[in-house]
């Protein structure tokens, strides 16, 4: 006998559940937002998160990739340096400009090709051919109302493997340690669960592992820190700003690496918090459907 809970799990339309979740959320950041932040993202070295992603993706030498939502090239550049051909796509023109600087810096013009493309674009009209790359990846970049359509676009483009990461806990922009300390509840969305279940419904066999990404937030003054962390209070918790200021004042310490390049390439601030913020990402990989199976 099948339990009610099992039946509900199997019968749930997870893409419709995802759409409802997106409708209740703050609107996704648009290209203009990422354009404004592009200069803070410069791929000059391979960071621990990128190394962990690449280890799990297991892209073979000589294989071609689609890097969807590539940003400034945190993965496209390392893959290019390994000799892989990469089609690096993003919906932010300025991000692609910064990527172009990285391509020229590393002399990767023959290996990494930037392309302006959004998840919700018509990929056929944009020239994205079926089974045109060996591996399709989307690292921390799936921001779309229709998750199933996005996953199917990756599936249709890749011949051998698809790899994505989605948040496994709360928002990557929220420091749970701080929020707990100042009495603000945090809703953990577990975005990856939706993708996993959609893929299962599509007949794929997704595999899941986790990447713990430590983040060290730095700032130069208390006021700067408050302004930066205040983003976590948007959407109904703005009245907790005094508690946030008090917390930061008691937990800010000198940063021994002040002035050195941070994760996004810009100089680190003079102060940091006395704890490391950890973000958990779910890495999901699957074998795409072949053209003869469609």
Regions found by a protein language model. Give the residues of each.
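Conserved class I S-adenosyl-L-methionine
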Residues: 2-60, 62-71
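Class I SAM-dependent methyltransferase SAM/SAH-binding core
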Residues: 79-122
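A short SAM/SAH-binding and catalytic strip from SAM-dependent methyltransferases
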Residues: 133-148
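Conserved beta-strand signature within the Rossmann-like core of class I S-adenosyl-L-methionine
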Residues: 159-169
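Short, glycine-/aromatic-enriched active-site segment of Class I SAM-dependent methyltransferases
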Residues: 167-186
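Conserved Class I S-adenosyl-L-methionine
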Residues: 210-294
């Amino acid at each position: 006998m099948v339990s009610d809970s099992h039946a509900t799990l199997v019968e749930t339309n997870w893409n419709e559940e995802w759409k409802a979740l997106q409708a209740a959320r703050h609107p996704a950041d648009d290209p203009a937002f990422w354009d404004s932040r592009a200069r803070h993202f410069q791929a000059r070295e391979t960071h621990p998160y990128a190394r962990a992603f690449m280890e799990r993706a297991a892209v073979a030498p000589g294989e071609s990739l689609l890097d969807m939502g590539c940003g400034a090239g945190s993965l496209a550049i390392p893959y290019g340096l390994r000799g892989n051909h990469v089609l690096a796509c993003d919906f932010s023109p300025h991000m692609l400009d910064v990527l172009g600087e990285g391509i020229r810096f590393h002399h990767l013009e023959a290996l990494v090709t930037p392309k302006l493309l959004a998840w919700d674009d018509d990929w056929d009209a944009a020239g994205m051919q079926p089974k045109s790359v060996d591996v399709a990846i989307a690292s921390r970049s799936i921001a779309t109302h229709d998750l199933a359509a996005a996953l199917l676009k990756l599936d249709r483009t890749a011949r051998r493997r698809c790899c994505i990461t989605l948040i496994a806990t709360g928002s990557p922009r929220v420091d749970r340690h701080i929020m707990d300390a100042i009495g603000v509840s945090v809703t953990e969305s577990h975005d990856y669960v939706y993708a996993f279940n959609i893929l299962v419904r599509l007949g794929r066999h997704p595999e899941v592992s986790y990447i713990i990404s430590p983040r060290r937030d730095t700032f130069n003054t208390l006021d700067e820190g408050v302004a930066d962390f205040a983003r976590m209070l948007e959407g109904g918790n703005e009245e907790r700003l005094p508690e946030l200021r008090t917390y930061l004042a008691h937990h800010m310490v000198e940063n021994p690496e002040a002035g050195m390049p941070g994760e996004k390439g810009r100089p680190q601030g003079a102060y940091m918090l006395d704890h490391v913020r950890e973000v958990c990402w779910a890495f999901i990989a699957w074998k795409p459907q072949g053209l003869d199976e469609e």
